């Protein structure tokens, strides 16, 4: 199905909108990006769902990609991103499935504690520090060497080492070099404050009434040595009925060769809601 695209601005935040020629699905979809990324990371999924009649959107948090730059990253915390999400969802309207990846997985869960959404897809999220401690999971130490992130003026600086980006974000042999070029070009700064606040953030699962689909991941692929899949722990805490491990696939599976396999999995779940 044909579709049109546009950039919709809500305050200082920009949304990418893929509008199908005929909206045949009874749910809209909002894709939320991960740390240092933007709506561009969801380009394949946006076109996939728009072609199938879904009114599809992707947000850029303040200071990211198409949104207005942030003057002071130290003023940007979790509450600011939750405000961006609320403004975006008010603009979109209707019944919306919200997809969060990595950093934004916990953000969309926190949002859903106090807002109604049609469903939540939580992809390769972290879990709160308190839940790790409750389950007796040892926290990994900070990364060293090339993997250590530089922080300047409250902002986490994006990694520009090509081989490190490939190792951390993609499965070996599952991504073309043009996609790696895109990621290196497009990755931007992230709020260090948000990263710290997310780790300390508490979730109240009983407040989340929307159906939840949790997608797990082998954290060793991004240099984290953990005894369990954190997303399985999260799914159990949320009492989520739907849980699946993304495999084969790297952290940025939505940009890998087999991205369509996962888009189809999303579609099956969305259609069941």
Model-found features: residue ranges?
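Conserved alpha/beta-hydrolase
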Residues: 46-70
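Flexible "cap/lid" loop of the alpha/beta hydrolase fold
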Residues: 120-152, 194-195
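Active-site loop/oxyanion-hole signature of alpha/beta-hydrolase fold enzymes
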Residues: 64-96
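Short beta-strand/loop motif that positions the catalytic acidic residue
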Residues: 208, 214-216
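Conserved loop-alpha-helix segment in the C-terminal half of the alpha/beta-hydrolase fold
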Residues: 216-249
């Amino acid at each position: 199905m044909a579709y049109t695209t546009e950039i919709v601005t809500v305050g200082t935040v920009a949304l990418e909108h893929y509008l199908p020629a005929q909206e045949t699905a009874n749910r809209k979809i909002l894709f939320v990006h991960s740390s240092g990324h933007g709506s561009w990371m969801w380009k394949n999924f946006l076109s996939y769902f728009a072609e199938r009649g879904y009114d599809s959107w992707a947000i850029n948090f303040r200071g990211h990609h198409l949104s207005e730059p942030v003057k002071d990253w130290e003023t940007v915390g979790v509450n600011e991103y939750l405000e961006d999400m609320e403004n975006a969802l008010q603009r979109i309207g209707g019944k919306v499935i919200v997809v969060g990846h990595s950093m934004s997985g916990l953000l969309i869960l926190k949002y859903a504690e106090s807002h109604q959404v049609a469903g939540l897809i939580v992809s390769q999220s972290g879990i709160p520090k308190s839940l790790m401690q409750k389950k007796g999971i040892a926290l990994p130490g900070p990364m060293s060497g090339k993997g250590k992130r530089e922080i300047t003026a409250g902002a986490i600086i994006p990694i520009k080492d090509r081989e490190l980006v490939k190792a951390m974000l993609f499965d070996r042999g599952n991504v073309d070099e043009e996609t790696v070029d895109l990621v290196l070009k497009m990755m931007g700064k992230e709020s260090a404050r948000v990263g710290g606040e997310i780790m300390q953030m508490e979730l109240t699962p009983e407040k989340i009434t929307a159906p939840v689909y949790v997608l797990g991941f082998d954290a060793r692929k991004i240099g984290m040595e953990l005894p369990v899949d954190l997303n399985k722990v999260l799914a159990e805490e949320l009492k989520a009925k739907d849980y699946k491990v993304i495999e084969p696939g790297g952290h940025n599976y939505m940009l890998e060769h087999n991205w369509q396999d996962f888009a189809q999995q999303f579609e099956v779940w969305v259609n069941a809601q």
